[in-house]
Structure formats: C-alpha cells, structure tokens
A protein has these predicted regions:
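Non-catalytic signal-transmission and effector/linker regions of two-component phosphorelay proteins
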Residues: 1-3
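Short hydrophobic transmembrane-like helices used for membrane targeting/insertion
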Residues: 5, 51-52
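Acidic, metal-coordinating helix/loop segments flanking the phosphotransfer/catalytic sites
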Residues: 18, 33-51
Length: 52
C-alpha cells in the first residue's frame, strides 16, 4: 500500500479529501494529515510517505 499525507489548510476540504476518496480501492492508506506546509514537511520527514 502507498502511504499518503494530506496537506491542506482548510479543515473542511482536508476532511473531505480524506473521507470522500476510497483510499483502500486505490491501494493507499492515510498516514497523516497536516494543516499547513510546515506541518506537512515535518510529517514527510518523519513518515516518509509515497504521496503528499
């Protein structure tokens, strides 16, 4: 499975991306989410995702 991090500053949009897409059907798992680029960069270093 591919590890995905969702980075989006708008909470409703970020939650919508996470909840409306069938990630399992795409062979993906949500490894984390971030509210801004700085948090996203920290998660990327820590989690080594395949997709951001």
């Amino acid at each position: 499975m591919y590890k995905v991090i969702v980075v989006e500053d708008e909470t409703m949009v970020r939650r919508g991306i996470i909840l409306t897409i069938d990630w399992a059907a795409l062979d993906c798992v949500i490894a984390g989410e971030a509210a801004n680029g700085e948090e996203g960069a920290e998660l990327a270093v820590r989690l080594s995702p395949d997709i951001i």
